[in-house]
Structure formats: C-alpha cells, structure tokens
Amino acid sequence: NALIVKENEDIKKMYWSRNVRLRISDKAEHRVFIWAINECKKYGSFNTYLELLYDIKDKISVQELYKATLEMSDIKCDVASSMTDYYLKEIFNILQQNFIDDDEKCAELATLEWMCRNVLEWEHMKCMQKIMKDDPTFYALLVSIIYKADDNENIDEEKRKLANKVYSGFDKAKFCPTEKDGEVIYENLKKWIEKFKELLINQKQERLFGNLVGRLLAYSPIGEDGYSPCEAVRMVIEEYYTDSLKTAYVVAEENKRGVHMVDSGKSELILHQRYQKNAEALQERYPYTADIYFSISDNYKREAEYERKRAEDEW
C-alpha cells in the first residue's frame, strides 16, 4: 500500500478499483485506515469502497464509519456484487444501532438507505422505517409521484420514469404508522392518519386514502388481548372504515402468507378457523374490524373447499 502513494493517477485508479480484496494489516496505525478510505473514495469503485468499509469497520470509530458511509453517495454505483447486500446490511446495522435516535443522522441514513432500496430489504432499512412511521410526508410524496391526481393530470415521460424508479421502494414499505417496539398509541396513530389524509387532499389524491391506509394498517402488531390488529388500529378502522380500506387490508393480510405448500386445503382450513376466531373476538366492540377478519376467514374457507375438491378429482 505504501508504494501506491507514489504512483500516477491512472495506476492509483487501477489499484483501488481492481476486483481483488484490499488488505490492510491489523497492526496498521489508525491514520492508515483513514488514508485508505480517502484514497478508495477518490480512485475506487462503489464495490471496492463498500468492501473496504466492511473490512475496517472495527478499526475506525462509529462516527468515522458514519461519515465514510454517507460519502458513498458521491461514488458512481457500479453493478452490485453478490456481497453488496451483505456489506450494506452489516454496515447499516452498526450505524442504525448508534444513530436511530439522533433525528439528524437518522434522516441522513434514511436517505442513503433509500438510495440502496433495490439492494436492501425493507427490514434492513430501519431509519427509513422510522421516518415513515413517525411522519407521513415522505410516504405521501411517493404516492404523488406514483399515482395520478384526481383531476386526471397528464403524465409526461419524465414523471413516468421517476414513478418507475421509486415504485419498488414504495412497494417494499410495509409498516404500521407510529408503531414503536410493538406498540401503537391511538393518539399518535390518529394524528398520522389525519396528516396523511390532509396531504392527499392537497395532492388531489383523496380517493386513494382508504386503499393506502388499509394496506398499511394490516401490518399492525397484535393487541394486548392476543388478537389482531392492536387496539389502537381497531379504533382507527372503526373511525375511518370504507370498502376500499377493507379490501386493501384483506389483500395485504392474505399476501403475507407468501409461497406455501398445497395440502388438499388443510392449511386453508386452519387459517379459516384462526381468522374466524379472531373476528368473533372483535365482533362486539369492533364490528367493522371484525367484518374484515370474517371476510379473510370466508376467503380461506372457499379456498379450502376448492383445494379439497381438486385433490379429490385428481384421485
């Protein structure tokens, strides 16, 4: 590494961007690690810089790691390697643990997480989660980019391209507003919902309110009584219930199941019974919420019968 200091710019660029892991002795002085970061940022590729940060993350302070990570945004991103997502996840994990309660640093990290949205999974975008859970402004901004306004605005090619770029990140954003450590406080949730509705009205997109809210509320934690959703979300559903909210909630809840084995309808029958029990527990105090869970239960009952008959026909 010492020899490369004396080389010309082209040689330095070749050295720092080559597909060979950069090695720095564990016995090197602290200033060597900082020098390597600066040189790799100047001459290396996104992947070599990221790999270097991962390798020396325990050799520099968390503040230095934070600063160096933010500076990734200045490097042109090349094709992701097979290890890119792992390196990002590990580096972000350190920074999230240290700075998620620092509003300014959390916002900076959320911006960087968003830049890496095509590589990071949603569960690893903890600062972006916090930003969206605490305030609906950014989520509403994404809605304004992706969906047309109520006045049938003309969509130009530039906006269409932007919508395509951000949609994957929007689609990943599955969260219950204001949820923190498995708890949702009604007053906070209602405030979030009201602000979100106001933003949609200002964007001339009020028609989307029920659909979008239903999609998010399906990610509520379990209530204190052991039934879903939690009490605060039940209260909000009772207050803001619409057919579109119900439909979106049902779809989001059923989509959580993901890929599953076909077993002649046995799994669907169990789900039917589980959702029916949940609905019956809510029926007296939260009729609209119960209606949502009865609908999910009925859907699984029909699917169970269909799978059973199909299995019988195959025999």
What spans do the regions from the language model cover?
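Short amphipathic alpha-helical heptad-repeat segments
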Residues: 264-276
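Inter-repeat boundary and helix-capping residues of tandem alpha-helical solenoids
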Residues: 261, 268-269, 286-287
